[in-house]
């Protein structure tokens, strides 16, 4: 028997290994009879459908998530006037911070996301009126 000290991800382990001597190849083991298949688990209940987002007022425009990610910060609030190109919020996707900007001069009608919230592509984030 040989002893080794192995380090994995910074943790040291003492390992004992049996030494195998060269010998004639062992006969193939006999096949064991197949076990009966395990019963399948009941399917998980379907998740409840997400609540529909509130309708957008006539003449308003929504700024939608261009990609899935996490909202790092929201730079605007309802009632705030914004100019074209002004940062509305910061969306982190694939470890990159993406500034989501106002597409035109407008007033923020509603902010539908908050910091640390996860969004999917196409989710409404800000409503501009």
Curated annotation (Swiss-Prot):
Location of the region described as Disordered in the Swiss-Prot/TrEMBL record: 24-58
Residues of the signal peptide: none
Reaction equation(s) it catalyzes: (S)-methylmalonyl-CoA + Na(+)(in) + H(+)(out) = propanoyl-CoA + Na(+)(out) + CO2
Record keywords, A-Z: Biotin, Cell membrane, Ion transport, Membrane, Sodium, Sodium transport, Translocase, Transport
Modified-residue entries (N6-biotinyllysine), positions: 95
Keyword Ligase attached: no
Biased composition annotated in UniProt, kind: Low complexity: 24-39, 49-58
InterPro entries membership: Biotin_BS (IPR001882), Biotin_Carboxyl_Carrier/Decarb (IPR050709), Biotin_lipoyl (IPR000089), Single_hybrid_motif (IPR011053)
PROSITE patterns: BIOTIN, BIOTINYL_LIPOYL
GO biological process, one term: sodium ion transport
Top-level class of the enzyme under EC nomenclature: translocase
EC number in record: 7.2.4.3
Regulation of protein activity: Completely inhibited by avidin.
Subcellular location: Cell membrane
Cofactor: biotin
GO CC annotation, single: plasma membrane
Residues of the Biotinyl-binding domain: 51-129
Quaternary structure annotation from Swiss-Prot or TrEMBL: The methylmalonyl-CoA decarboxylase is composed of five subunits: the carboxyltransferase alpha subunit (MmdA), the tunnel beta subunit (MmdB), the biotin-containing gamma subunit (MmdC), and the delta (MmdD) and epsilon (MmdE) subunits.
Function: Biotin-containing subunit of the sodium ion pump methylmalonyl-CoA decarboxylase, which converts the chemical energy of a decarboxylation reaction into an electrochemical gradient of Na(+) ions across the cytoplasmic membrane, thereby creating a sodium ion motive force that is used for ATP synthesis. Can also convert malonyl-CoA into acetyl-CoA.
Protein name according to UniProt: Methylmalonyl-CoA decarboxylase subunit gamma
The organism of origin for this protein: Veillonella parvula
Organism placement in taxonomy: Bacteria, Bacillati, Bacillota, Negativicutes, Veillonellales
């Amino acid at each position: 028997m040989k002893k080794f000290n192995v380090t994995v991800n910074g943790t040291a382990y003492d390992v004992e290994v049996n030494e195998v001597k060269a010998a004639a190849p062992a006969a193939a083991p006999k096949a064991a009879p197949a076990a009966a298949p395990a019963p399948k688990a009941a399917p998980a209940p379907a998740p409840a459908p997400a609540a529909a987002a509130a309708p957008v007022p006539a003449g308003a425009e929504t700024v939608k998530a261009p990609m899935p990610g996490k909202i790092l910060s929201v730079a605007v609030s309802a009632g705030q006037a914004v100019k074209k190109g002004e940062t509305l919020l910061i969306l982190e996707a694939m470890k990159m911070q993406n500034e989501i900007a106002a597409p035109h001069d407008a007033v923020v009608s509603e902010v539908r996301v908050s910091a640390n919230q996860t969004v999917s592509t196409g989710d409404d984030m800000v409503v501009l009126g």
